Design a protein with these regions (language model features):
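Acidic, divalent-metal-binding catalytic cores of TOPRIM
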Residues: 1-302
Length: 302
């Protein structure tokens, strides 16, 4: 989608979100929650309702629209309604506004991809015994597969973060449109499907930038402290989906792997998650950070 069409779509979605808020204000004592995307609520809503009660969900289509909504409505409505704003940090500087919850890492998708979250997915979704050899093998498999995926996507994450920093600090603008999955022209990730077809020179040529190795090194030092949290969340969740699909299908005998060589020797009770449903299905197993808990406690009604 070109920039003009995206801007038009974003404007239309903002009008819809604004209208939804205006309708919501007819409900006395309501709590309005403004999210970036349609599926963000899949992660947030259970936590919000547990602490704050019922809510009115208002997807705004993008981060810019959540920020715009705040500018337009907050000052005149903050004393009448409970208004909560949820945004992904992405590769931007922290907003540092207490009226917002901002993810500690790149996005909510990253909260599903930590080792702790994967452990809960194994025990609470796939019903793998925490003390079993299957559990140990699956955790080792997770570590190895994410290590391999990060070896492919690391340089691109450093590069894209450097681009965002250049845009902010140098008042430059680049048109880099990213899909949800890792760009096929740059390589591939997923179990048994790792390939890297790029370097910094190719990235600069492909996207019309002039990022230097020093720029990359600066981002590397920040992002590589915890790749599962700090790398682009869409690629992290792509890798998690690949791992889960592989484990489930292999255990079901669909991978032509002898049982003695499978990661999970006991077949899980659950089937593969349908496309687009992972954030909803696994929401209870994703990390629930203290930062989010503290933010929601501000809206608690005793």
């Amino acid at each position: 989608m070109d920039e003009a069409k995206e801007a038009s779509k974003s404007a239309e979605k903002f009008v819809v979100a604004k209208h939804r808020f205006e309708c919501a204000t007819k409900t006395e004592g309501c709590m309005c929650c403004f999210f970036e995307g349609l599926h963000d609520k899949d992660y947030y809503k259970t936590h919000i309702r547990t602490i704050c009660g019922e809510i009115i969900e208002i997807p705004c289509h993008c981060k810019a629209n959540v920020l715009k909504m705040y500018r337009e409505i907050h000052s005149t409505n903050k004393d009448k309604y409970r208004l909560a704003y949820f945004i992904d940090r992405d590769f931007d500087e922290l907003l540092n506004n207490p009226d917002f919850f901002e993810t500690e890492g790149y996005s909510i998708e990253n909260y599903y991809c930590s080792a702790d979250a994967f452990s809960r997915i194994l025990t609470d979704y796939l019903y793998v015994d925490h003390n079993s050899d299957d559990y140990r093998r699956a955790m080792d498999f997770y570590d190895e597969q994410f290590r391999m995926a990060h070896s492919i996507v690391a340089e691109f994450n450093h590069y894209y973060s450097a681009v965002k920093r250049r845009e902010k600090n140098c008042n430059e603008k680049y048109s880099i449109e990213l899909e949800d999955s890792f760009p096929k022209e740059l390589g591939s990730i997923g179990v048994n499907n790792y390939r890297k077809d790029y370097d910094l020179e190719r990235l600069n040529m492909l996207y019309g930038t002039s990022i230097t190795q020093s720029d990359l090194d600066a981002e590397k030092g920040r992002l590589d402290v915890c790749p599962c949290l700090m790398y682009r969340g869409k690629y992290e969740i792509q890798q998690l989906e690949s791992i889960l699909e592989y484990l489930i299908k292999e255990a079901a005998g669909e991978r032509n792997v002898h049982k003695e060589n499978r990661v999970l020797r006991k077949r899980p009770k659950m089937n593969c998650i349908q496309p687009g449903q992972l954030l909803l299905v696994l929401s209870a197993m994703a990390d629930f950070t203290q930062g989010l808990r503290n933010y929601l406690n501000k809206f608690r009604i005793e």
